[in-house]
Amino acid sequence: MTPRIPPLPPEQWPPEMNEALAALRPPNPRHPFPPRDPSRPKGLNILGTLAQHPELARAYHSFNGHVLFASTMSPRQRELLVLRVAHVRGAEYEWSQHVIQGRDAGLTDDEIVRIHTGPEAPGWSTLDRALLTAADELVADARISDGTWLALASELDVRQLMDVVFTVGAYEVLAMAMRSFGVELDDDLPPGRKSPSP
C-alpha cells in the first residue's frame, strides 16, 4: 500500500506536534503510561501522518488519552475492544500496535488469537464475551443491543458503560483514518505482530 498522506519524519514535525503528543497524557490518569523502551515500536508512521495536521492530532490525542490512560475500564478490557475493532475493520496497523499493548495489559497469546473468532469463541468469561459482542454491534449498527447492554450492565457501572462505547468509537475512527490515509506498518514492528485479514 502506498501512503495517500505520507508521514513526516520526526525532524520535520511542526512545533505544534509537541502539544499534540502532550495531549495524550490526561491530567488524572488511572493507568500507567507505557515504559520508555527503545526496543518498542514507536508508531512513527501514524504519528508522522498526524503531524501533517497537528491541530487535529491534538484534539484526537486528548480524546484518545482518556481512552488509554483515564478510562474506567481496565487496560485488558480496553484492549479486548480495540483489538476486536481492529480485526473487524481489517486495520492491520491498529492490530499490530495493540497486540503489544494487549500483552502489556494481560491478554494471553491464546486470547489474542481468539479475538479473531470473536465472542462465539470458547473460553471467554461472560463479561469478555459481552465486550466483544458490544464491539461487533457498535461497528455494525452503531448501537449496543438490549441483551448485550444488560449483560454489560450486570458487571459494569455507568461510567464504564460509557467508556465501552467511546473506546470502540475512538478506534473505529482511527481505523478509518489509517486505512483511508494508507498508513503503512512501521519497520520497527517485530515479526509476527501482523493480523491476518478478517
Regions found by a protein language model. Name each.
Residues 125-165:
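Acidic/histidine-rich alpha-helical segments that form the ligand environment
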Residues 47-50, 60-67, 80-86, 115-116, ...:
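Short alpha-helical scaffolding segments that buttress acidic/His motifs in well-ordered protein cores
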Residues 151-153, 160, 169, 173, ...:
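Acidic, carboxylate-rich catalytic segments that either coordinate divalent cations
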Residues 1-2, 37-38, 55-60, 90-95, ...:
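Short acidic alpha-helix initiation/capping motifs at coil-to-helix transition points
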